[in-house]
Amino acid sequence: MGAGEERPEALGFNPQKEIVYNLLLPYAHRLDRESNELLAQIKGSLGRAVRLRELWPGVLFWTRKLTTYIRLYGRKFSKEDHVLFVKLLYELVTIPKLEISMMQGFARLLISLLKKKELLSREDLQLPWRPLYEMLERILYSKTEHLGLNWFPNSVEGVLKTLVKACRPYFPDDATAEMLQEWLPLMCPFDVTMQKAISYLELFLPTSLPPDLHCKGFRLWFDEFLTLWVSVQNLPQWEGHLVNLFARLANDNIGYIDWDPYVPKIFTRILRSLNLPVGSNQVLVPRQLANAYDIGHAVIWITALMGGPSKTVQKHLTGLFNSITSFYHPSNNGRWLTKLMKLLQRLPCCIIRRLHRERYKKPSWLTPVPESHRLTDQDVTDFVESIMQPVLLAMFSKTGSLEAAQALQNLALMRPELVIPPVLEKTYPALETLTEPHQLTATLSCVIGVARSLVSGGRWFPEGPTHMLPLLMRALPGVDPNDFSKCMITFQFIATFSTLVPLVDCSSLLQERNDLSEVERELCSATAEFEDFVLQFMDRCFALIESSALEQTREETETEKMTHLESLVELGLSSTFSTILTQCSKEIFKVALEKVFNFAVSNIFETRVSGRMVADLCRAAVKCCPVESLKLFLPHCCNVISHLTINDDVMNDEELDKELLWKLQLLSEITRVDGEKLLPYKEQLVQILHRTLHFTCKQGYTLSCNLLHHLLRSSTLIYPTEYCSVPGGFDKPLSDYFPIKDWGKPGDLWNLNIKWHVPSAEEMDFAYYLLDTFLRPELQKLDLYSSGELEMSRDEVQQCLAIVHNCLTGSGNLLPPLHGERVTHLVTSMVSLNETKLFTGIDHDHSRENYRELISKTLRKLLHYILDHSEDDTKSLFLIIKIISDLLQFQGSHKHEFDSRWKSFTLVKKSMENRLHGKKRHIRALLIDRVMLQHELRTLTVEGCEYKKVHQDMLRDLLRLSTSSYGQVRNKAQQAFFTALGTYNFCCRDLIPLVLEFLRPERQDVTQQQFKGALYCLLGNHGGVCLANLHDWECIVQTWPAMISSGLSKAMSLEKPSIVRLFDDLAEKIHRQYETIGLDFSVPEKCIEIAILLQHAASTSSQLPHPEELALAIKRQGEKNVEAVQNYERLVNTLLDCVTQRNLPWKFEHIGIGFLSLLLRDDYVLPVRAIRYLVQCLNHDALIVRKMAISTVAGILKQLKRTHVKETICPYKISGCPKPESKLVGDRPDNQWLLYDSSNLPNTKEAWESCCFVEKTHWGYSSWPQNMLVYAPADQQPKVGRSREEMSEAEQIIYDHFTDEKFVDQLIKFLSLEDRKGKDKFNPRRFCLFKGLFRNYDDAFLPIIKPHLERLVADSHESTQRCAAEIVAGLIRGSKHWTFEKVENLWNFLCELLRTALSNITVETYSDWGTCIATSCESRDPRKLHWLFELLLESPVSGEGGSFVDACRLYVLQGGLAQQEWRVPELLHRLLMCLEPKLTQVYKNVRERIGSVLTYIFMIDVSLPNTAPTKSPHISDFTGRILGKLKPLMDADEEIQNHVMEENGVGEQDERTQAIKLMKTILKWIMASAGRSFCTGVTEQMQLLPLLFKIAPVENDTNYDELKRDAKTCLSLMSQGLLLPVQVPLVLDVLRQTARSSSWHARYTVLTYIQTMVFYNLFIFIHNEESVQGVRWLILQLMEDEQLEVREMAATTLSGLLQCNFLTMDAAMQAHFEALCKTRLPKKRKRESGMVGDTIPSGDLVKRHAGVLGLSACILSSPYDVPTWMPQLLMDLSVHLNDPQPIEMTVKKTLSNFRRTHHDNWQEHKQQFTDDQLIVLTDLLVSPCYYA
């Protein structure tokens, strides 16, 4: 650090990490005192606020101040303070009952405190993990959110996860072991808890522990998780999380883990997860696409594995790119493309990050990468070489060249000599082409990315800089008025290169110096062209300007403003020109200045488009060298203007002379320069202002106002005056300065030598003189006018206001902010809430007139006058609104301009940064820009300002304007109003009552416009404050009821669509943004302990609280909580009063009920009156109200739920087994007691009560939790069967309604109506309602509901059946805690009911009954539901009621059993026994269902690590039995035809027919399980392969019967399966055996199978040389097959495998094919003399054809380039053009394909051929035979 040494003395502490740019500000010397005062204030006040337990406003106010402090100064505090801040915020964030919006605020601050983890080591800080886990559990897995008892914002998940990531490095050493204990018991792979466990582990597990703690860290879980990952398949959702965890682990511990054994698997998985389409006829597995790996993490993982002694990773990476390169070709497009592009962009970026960390980063406490595993130069070279080809292809991708450009930028930092030449090779031709402009934009954007590497040359690529001038000269034609995008990229290109290079002509040095290198001499002579380049560029710009003049581009009547495109071109033009002139030598500048001056003076431009552009160019010139340029321009303009205004009549002209306007415009732009240089001309300028400021012509006086505005800004602002790429510029003699050394040189942060413009006393005087001369008279005029003492026309008033506005915005930072007294009584606080004053470079001179005060006084008077006398003068009102908002906000820069400058700064920084070396090595201009932005940031830091009386007056004026009669005035005023609301502390509380005044129904005098305006003020703008929904009881208590009551206002009219829409928007916004507001604001003691430390760390001890204050604080905290509850109840009651008013329009009643539903909470029961009202709403006439009521009453029932007692058990005691020694998952002796056992069911009261029920299905599968909780026995639970007297008032209300038959009748009637035909589904809200009723009141309502249920079930209508299903599910779930007698009675009734229901099931309702049963069984002990399971298993497939009922019963049964997962093996066995005889079912729908049920039966049979063999059915036994039955098909030779019709024939059928029927069902099973199960039972299913090959057809034909179609799908799905290395030989055996089959269909299908299988398991195969050879042998053998189709497919397969580099075209293979080609054919005569019918090809012809096919496969395997061996192969092929068919056809096809694929880049490809070869080739490609 250049300034690192002296900081501790200056500050009194060693700062953690400050923002260095602050040290470069012109007033840097004053900042240390300022920041120290602010820091002391923050520490003192924040500590005090916490000790006084005042979360709001105190703590919130001061944490915001800390956030601002970090934004302004960085982490400019000592390490001790840093730790205290972190600890305090950690305690605050984890307060259990903290309001959610506060929690998010604290969390964001804590994240930014922990963001730079190198600043605090594990020694400095430890944070516990459990409070964070409890918070995530409470919020992300909230039990009450879905019932509407908690409202969390959408952002909360992201914030919490980021918070955990930030705290993770500081978890204690034992955290890993504790986390595993907590979450491993959840790891049951069939359950959703698996996803939860893995995502928690991914989020929390610390991976950056130091090496000596690895045994306490990842070593505890690494092997177990990795083997788990290796053995799963089909991407279950949690697999992605594991990958993210491994990626992070690998990245944090490079060199400490040996990943080599897993590399082939890792790459195979990554390749699979790209979901690329492969193979000749493929059906992609319907995997959930969202489950693919996150490319970002996959890339981090790959990067972390690179380097080190073994080079396997680079080898695999090269393999990966070889296999996917062709997908990058621009002609390919698909949804997979975005992933591929992201891969390209991220990889180089990650490698750069890693290189930076290993070679350049400052060492910190984080473990460094060991020397042995760092990336060597050779590693880097290999990497760059492997990725170059895809990147070059991606340059022209359909999705644009952005990713390629970013990749090239990073690659060029590593190896410019490998990267830049190929890019240039593509760029030069693109610059010449006229027909393909997209090539130009793509290549230029890529060259911009590599510009810095190109220009700086360096040891790797010294010849780089020589390309710069040729590129610049060739790019000039891109400045083309007819092609906008080309124009913009060219400007960017030229600007980028000019910024990097001083444009100085050094050619004279060639004579003087002889110590120059070859490249330097070449560059010196080239620089002679700079001048030429600049002049040519200017000519191009002038042409562009002339063609875009207003007269040329549109009619006079059209818009006067520039179009969006024009303004972009204007910006590009002026910034590029300004960059070029900044970088010019004096000599070149003079020539350019002369040229631009002549152009500007010799023409007259219109002032709207071309005039603006020319004035911009002139301004750019003047800015670079103010003295010389002003001498040229200023007197000229002044003279012309004076001359043209000699005659006083000009003042009153409506239209001014074109030349006068143009010169005025030019003058107003060239005065935007260093204010000091304007002083010599001040008299002339003032004279011009006198002459022009009061033109009658608006265009004239506007330009004159601009001049005044710019003069004021130039004199009073602080800004840098030059942006040259080298400090001090290039104006030095060449003898002492050699510019070429500075090509591409970065700025040096510690020697920037910024030249600042700081206003001098003389300039200040000039500014005040201007204000006194021009502003004061206007204000006096307006003052007289608004007193009625002076007549003025509207135009004159507008002119006055325009001058006032320009004076105000010109001198914004000169005028001190408005003063006055504070508005008190808005909030009470025991902590000071003072605003912070920042020094921004100017000491305000209070002895002079403060014009800001004066303007505000005059304007308010004027505003009231206009509103009272001429409200329709909207143009004046617009100006007044602008002035008010600038009076309030403006201190020299506007927020939106600053934001867009910050954005463009970031863009430029990104496009030219060097991430490899880091350390802010940006170009000097960019660094200066950043310092300037830092200064502007300080001027804009205004939030948290005190709310003073002056502000109050102006805000009230804005509110009056926001409710005025004119829509446009309202709109503009509202925007200003919203901005101001966000600026002043607590002002909303002052304004809400004033806004609501307009909505009061009693008022008779409110107009519709005022009503609308007030509603808009409540609604707020996008992203700003929304008054209607402040997170504060006191505000909501006022706003919500007022909105409802406004429905009775006279101004309200439901006929007006705009008003209806406003209410809709308001309601929608409140629902979207509402977050639960806190009722408990207590501060725990833990926070207070840290606050005391923090206060003592503050240097000022004056604020330490007094003991009396502390006592008062505790009292205040209690009062605040009571007050919150009172406000809450008041709000609910007021809303009820509003909603029940007579005559209230229905719309408002609905909105009101919506508001009530937001007020449900989980920590406070809704007031009784509201409960009564909402229960009555269940039978409201309006459907929308009934829907809301159903949800709300379900929530109320949850609030009224009584808690059930739990107790801890020891599972080992219950099972009587000891704890297992080693880790074992699945069916173990100690969890057998959990399983369903029909011989030991709890079907008596004693058995029921002694049975230990475990409801959650995942417990016990993986391991038992530390503390296993189950429900305590019934006698300890809340009483069941209470009488009405024993209930609370709230419970009685619900009880009374649901025991009232009429009420229930009506409710059921409503519930069984249909809502949207055919769209309705089982409704979980209604289910929750019934579940709540039966849970809270056990069977009290059963007698009333029973008859309804019986009626509903008997009716087969869709809506009635659905209603029954919802109630039944609610009953079964609600009966969880009933006593045995009640449950038994319930089931006696339900069994009958369900039997009826299942026999009445229909197409529309079967999925609802499925949902009903699945919902009833989820997370329930199966032994509790034994009645249900026995019922469902009575006769799953009986044939009664037809095939449809069977299919439905199976569906319902599957729903129930699937929820039970591993706990019902007995039932699964019983079901399988039932189904096996039925597998030959004839009906398709039953077969499909059986297939699906089988998948679930075998789901539990998984081969995961440490898993015991399951008690549930095993796939292998089942497949064995099936294969026996399929034997008749296996043995048969001929192709299998499906001749079984869909009805059952009479009598016994032969074995073969039975086997075909069986096969059909088995196919359905394989299809269903392909996408679902974790592990395909590969070894077993492999044995079915030969049969599938036999059945599957070759062509795609929709007429094929089901059997063939399914067989084809199964093959496709199986070929995509993930193979374990042991399985590869098995599969190859099956394929070999099939390749000998007599059916050519089977042989053909083997090939398509190989294509997909190899690609989807690429690295597993490549890893094993034997299997590669096996595949190769198979293909070569099939290439000589007697069937033509098989040969051709073998060739296609070969070509594909060559293309993805699985096989290589080695000499042996080439020789093999060439030999086959030379096979002699029988003489033609002999052939003809044979029989006419003799079409079987002779063996010789087959062999020769095989050879030709082999050669053609090689040619087609390189579709996008010409390798060295290709020309010769093409020649070999051409010999066979006249061979007999099918050889001739093959040759033709190959040649036409070659021509098609190589046509695009033929110029480049031509180079590979000799002249002779080219002649032959040209003949071939256009020979007559080509068209024959």
Curated annotation (Swiss-Prot):
<feature type="repeat" description="HEAT 6">
    <location>
        <begin position="1665"/>
        <end position="1703"/>
    </location>
</feature>
<dbReference type="InterPro" id="IPR016024">
    <property type="entry name" value="ARM-type_fold"/>
</dbReference>
<dbReference type="Pfam" id="PF23096">
    <property type="entry name" value="HEAT_PSME4"/>
</dbReference>
<dbReference type="GO" id="GO:0035092">
    <property type="term" value="P:sperm DNA condensation"/>
</dbReference>
<keyword id="KW-0539">Nucleus</keyword>
<dbReference type="GO" id="GO:0005829">
    <property type="term" value="C:cytosol"/>
</dbReference>
<feature type="repeat" description="HEAT 5">
    <location>
        <begin position="1621"/>
        <end position="1659"/>
    </location>
</feature>
<protein>
    <recommendedName>
        <fullName>Proteasome activator complex subunit 4</fullName>
    </recommendedName>
</protein>
<dbReference type="InterPro" id="IPR011989">
    <property type="entry name" value="ARM-like"/>
</dbReference>
<dbReference type="InterPro" id="IPR035309">
    <property type="entry name" value="PSME4"/>
</dbReference>
<dbReference type="Pfam" id="PF11919">
    <property type="entry name" value="PSME4_C"/>
</dbReference>
<feature type="repeat" description="HEAT 3">
    <location>
        <begin position="1164"/>
        <end position="1202"/>
    </location>
</feature>
<dbReference type="GO" id="GO:0006974">
    <property type="term" value="P:DNA damage response"/>
</dbReference>
<feature type="repeat" description="HEAT 4">
    <location>
        <begin position="1339"/>
        <end position="1377"/>
    </location>
</feature>
<dbReference type="InterPro" id="IPR021843">
    <property type="entry name" value="PSME4_C"/>
</dbReference>
<comment type="similarity">
    <text>Belongs to the BLM10 family.</text>
</comment>
<dbReference type="GO" id="GO:1990111">
    <property type="term" value="C:spermatoproteasome complex"/>
</dbReference>
<dbReference type="GO" id="GO:0006281">
    <property type="term" value="P:DNA repair"/>
</dbReference>
<feature type="repeat" description="HEAT 2">
    <location>
        <begin position="985"/>
        <end position="1024"/>
    </location>
</feature>
<dbReference type="GO" id="GO:0070628">
    <property type="term" value="F:proteasome binding"/>
</dbReference>
<comment type="subunit">
    <text>Homodimer. Interacts with the 20S and 26S proteasomes.</text>
</comment>
<dbReference type="InterPro" id="IPR032430">
    <property type="entry name" value="Blm10_mid"/>
</dbReference>
<dbReference type="InterPro" id="IPR055455">
    <property type="entry name" value="HEAT_PSME4"/>
</dbReference>
<keyword id="KW-0227">DNA damage</keyword>
<dbReference type="GO" id="GO:0010499">
    <property type="term" value="P:proteasomal ubiquitin-independent protein catabolic process"/>
</dbReference>
<keyword id="KW-0234">DNA repair</keyword>
<dbReference type="GO" id="GO:0070577">
    <property type="term" value="F:lysine-acetylated histone binding"/>
</dbReference>
<feature type="region of interest" description="Bromodomain-like (BRDL)">
    <location>
        <begin position="1635"/>
        <end position="1723"/>
    </location>
</feature>
<keyword id="KW-0647">Proteasome</keyword>
<dbReference type="Pfam" id="PF16507">
    <property type="entry name" value="HEAT_PSME4_mid"/>
</dbReference>
<dbReference type="GO" id="GO:0016607">
    <property type="term" value="C:nuclear speck"/>
</dbReference>
<dbReference type="GO" id="GO:0016504">
    <property type="term" value="F:peptidase activator activity"/>
</dbReference>
<comment type="function">
    <text>Associated component of the proteasome that specifically recognizes acetylated histones and promotes ATP- and ubiquitin-independent degradation of core histones during DNA damage response. Recognizes and binds acetylated histones via its bromodomain-like (BRDL) region and activates the proteasome by opening the gated channel for substrate entry. Binds to the core proteasome via its C-terminus, which occupies the same binding sites as the proteasomal ATPases, opening the closed structure of the proteasome via an active gating mechanism.</text>
</comment>
<feature type="repeat" description="HEAT 1">
    <location>
        <begin position="462"/>
        <end position="506"/>
    </location>
</feature>
<dbReference type="GO" id="GO:0005634">
    <property type="term" value="C:nucleus"/>
</dbReference>
<keyword id="KW-0963">Cytoplasm</keyword>
<keyword id="KW-0677">Repeat</keyword>
